[in-house]
A protein has these predicted regions:
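A short, flexible helix-boundary coil/loop motif
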Residues: 1-38, 53, 227-255, 305, ...
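Active-site-proximal, Lys/Arg-enriched surface segment
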Residues: 70, 74-148
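Electropositive, glycine- and tryptophan-enriched low-complexity nucleic-acid-binding patches
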Residues: 128-182, 271
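An anionic, glycine-rich sequence signature occurring as long contiguous blocks
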Residues: 205-304
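Short, conserved catalytic/metal-binding motifs centered on acidic residues
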Residues: 46, 60, 73, 104-115, ...
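Domain-level cores of phosphate- or acyl-group-handling catalytic modules
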Residues: 164-222
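Short, solvent-exposed helix-loop connector elements
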Residues: 31-34, 281-290, 302-322, 339-343
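Short, positively charged, Gly/Tyr-enriched micro-motifs
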Residues: 8, 21-89, 149, 201-203, ...
Length: 355
């Protein structure tokens, strides 16, 4: 008789949380010592549970009878982790099971997420500064790289940004990661934060198909986007790349539509996309394919809901919360694929990973 465990058709929350707690406990040694009043698993249970509930460490410890004291957990989160290790180990864990799930070729998306900082202006060291948004110029900023499979995001990497970091430096790291994957990349979709000469030069140098919305910089492109109908133009951006100024030329697809009162707007809406991909032949193709990336916005909203509620400005702890939130999503999709999804020809061997 076979001893293979059969999935019961769904993944239960306790199985998901136990799987991630076990994974963290196996991969990250906190070095608490034999005489510590709690062990690493206790800390990870609180951390993962708070992320899953979208609540604070303090609230979870207060309402759970068997949880350690909040101060004990928060102390170890502050003292036992550093930025480099959280980023390195976090990205390794994000990729560990995801790469098994991905098809032979995927579309990937790179995004910058700017979370506003409203604290003391004299305590913004280590934050990322950008143009004013939502009443501030200082942000807790994270770049994410993820594969999109059937409108679901599978996060491959997360990177925290501080002053001195640039979109191009982050993109260079992400493209280097993609170069090392066995999975093929059909195209890279980027948000407008990556629209500059350095990022476009990198994409061309790595020979990746790409699509991103343009920013209305300069009289030429503003004029192009204020008149005419759908068309393809050649455009140039100039910027410094490791010293001398470099000019990059690329096609811009301008797609035009009548607004017909949508959002109480009328007239012609013109959308410009920097794009170079074999499957994009017309401006409507560019808009259609870029719009598909918004199919994952529900996943991003989920990540915002499944992150620990906190007021801490500690960059290490905040990054840790983001990483665990992304791990929760990856693990759920991996477990669903491994244990619940319709078996393929030949089947899969399901092991009790959460037991």
């Amino acid at each position: 008789m076979s001893n293979t465990k059969q999935a019961d058709g769904e993944i239960h929350e306790d199985q998901l949380l136990n799987f991630l707690v076990n994974k963290l406990d196996e991969e990250v040694d906190l070095g608490l010592g034999a005489n510590a009043e709690i062990d690493a698993e206790d800390i990870y249970e609180v951390l993962v549970g708070a992320c899953a509930d979208g609540t604070s460490i303090s609230k979870l410890c207060e309402t759970s009878e068997d949880s350690p004291h909040e101060n004990t957990v928060l102390y170890h989160l502050r003292e036992k982790f550093d930025l480099a290790s959280v980023e390195r180990v976090g990205n390794a864990l994000l990729q560990k099971d995801v790469l098994e799930v991905l098809p032979e070729q995927v579309e990937v998306v790179a995004d910058l997420h700017l979370r506003p900082y409203y604290g003391d202006e004299d305590e913004t060291d280590g934050l990322y500064h950008s143009e004013a948004k939502r009443g501030t110029t200082a942000f807790h900023t994270y770049a994410t790289l993820y594969a999109r499979v059937k409108n679901k995001r599978h996060t491959l990497a997360v990177r925290r940004l501080a002053d001195g970091d640039t979109a191009s430096s982050v993109l260079a790291e992400f493209l280097g990661l993609l170069d090392g994957l066995d999975t093929g990349v059909k195209a890279v979709y980027l948000d407008r934060e990556f629209y500059d000469s350095k990022c476009l030069t990198l994409l061309q140098a790595h020979n990746y198909a790409y699509v991103m919305p343009i920013v209305r910089w300069g009289k030429t492109i503003k004029q192009e986007l204020s008149e005419g109908w759908s068309r393809i133009i050649q455009h140039k951006l100039t910027g410094k790349l490791d010293g001398p100024a470099v000019t990059v030329e690329f096609p811009v697809y301008i797609d035009c539509t009548y607004q017909n009162g949508r959002y109480d707007e009328h007239g012609v809406a013109r959308h410009g996309y920097a794009a170079d991909a074999p499957f994009i032949q017309t401006p409507r193709d560019a808009r259609y394919h870029y719009a598909k990336r918004f199919g994952i916005e529900a996943s991003y909203r989920l990540s915002e809901q499944s992150v620990v509620t906190t007021t801490t400005q500690n960059p290490v702890v905040r990054l840790l919360y983001v990483v665990v939130s992304l791990l929760l999503q990856n693990v759920w999709r991996y477990l669903h694929w491994e244990y619940v999804a319709t078996p393929r020809r030949g089947g899969r061997i399901s092991r009790a990973a959460w037991s």
